């Protein structure tokens, strides 16, 4: 929509009250959503919007640096959970690594243990290797594949099994 513009459409402020009527009327009450890489950026925006629409949210973020290196910090996921709770919605933090099968299973298990089910999965976790293709080493390339590709698989597989049991599920892959 040219009148609203790209930035206004995608970056409009999230209301500070959960359950506020969405412009399009889409409600997600009683749905449970997992968002990977939700400690900042688009993942944070997805988590906040899902909560605003009534979903219970698992906020997954390893807490590492943008390039995937560095020691993990629980604070990004915890900060988003605090924002969601301040809205009056429900959320729980998860700090597991999407790039391992155990991490993927633990993320989904967090949703099941906390909220009893999984209905929505947004695979958003990613790392940034700020290098041109010719300057990227095989190790850099593998790190990107481990998080972006394998991470999506490791979380989707157990989430899809849970969704099949529920008879409902939606999966979004971001790139």
Which ranges hold each PLM region?
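Substrate-binding pocket helix/loop in short-chain dehydrogenase/reductase
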Residues: 84, 132-133, 140-142
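Conserved glycine-rich Rossmann-like NAD(P)H-binding loop of the short-chain dehydrogenase/reductase
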Residues: 55-79
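Canonical Rossmann dinucleotide-binding motif of NAD(H)/NADP(H)-dependent dehydrogenases/reductases
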Residues: 29-58
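The beta1-alpha1 cofactor-binding region of Rossmann-like NAD(H)/NADP(H)-dependent oxidoreductases
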Residues: 74, 78, 95-106, 138
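A glycine-rich helix->loop->beta "capping" turn
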Residues: 87-90, 110-123, 129-132, 168
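A short, exposed helix-loop element centered on a Lys and neighboring polar residues
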Residues: 156-157
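A hydrophobic alpha-helix adjacent to the NAD(P)-binding/active-site core of NAD(P)-dependent oxidoreductases
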Residues: 128, 136, 144
């Amino acid at each position: 929509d040219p009148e609203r513009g790209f930035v206004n459409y995608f970056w409009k402020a999230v209301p500070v009250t959960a359950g506020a009527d969405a412009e399009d009327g889409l409600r997600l009450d009683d749905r449970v959503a997992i968002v990977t890489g939700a400690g900042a950026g688009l993942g944070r925006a997805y988590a906040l919007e899902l909560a605003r629409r009534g979903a219970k949210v698992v906020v997954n973020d390893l807490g590492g640096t943008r390039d995937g290196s560095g020691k993990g910090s629980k604070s990004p996921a915890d900060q988003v959970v605090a924002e969601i709770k301040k809205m009056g919605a429900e959320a729980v933090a998860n700090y597991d690594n999407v790039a391992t099968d155990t991490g993927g299973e633990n993320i989904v298990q967090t949703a099941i243990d906390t909220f009893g089910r999984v209905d929505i999965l947004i695979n958003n976790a990613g790392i940034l290797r700020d290098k041109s293709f010719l300057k990227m080493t095989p190790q850099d390339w593998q790190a990107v594949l481990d998080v972006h590709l394998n991470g999506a698989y490791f979380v989707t597989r157990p989430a899809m099994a849970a969704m099949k049991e529920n008879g409902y599920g939606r999966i979004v892959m971001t790139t």
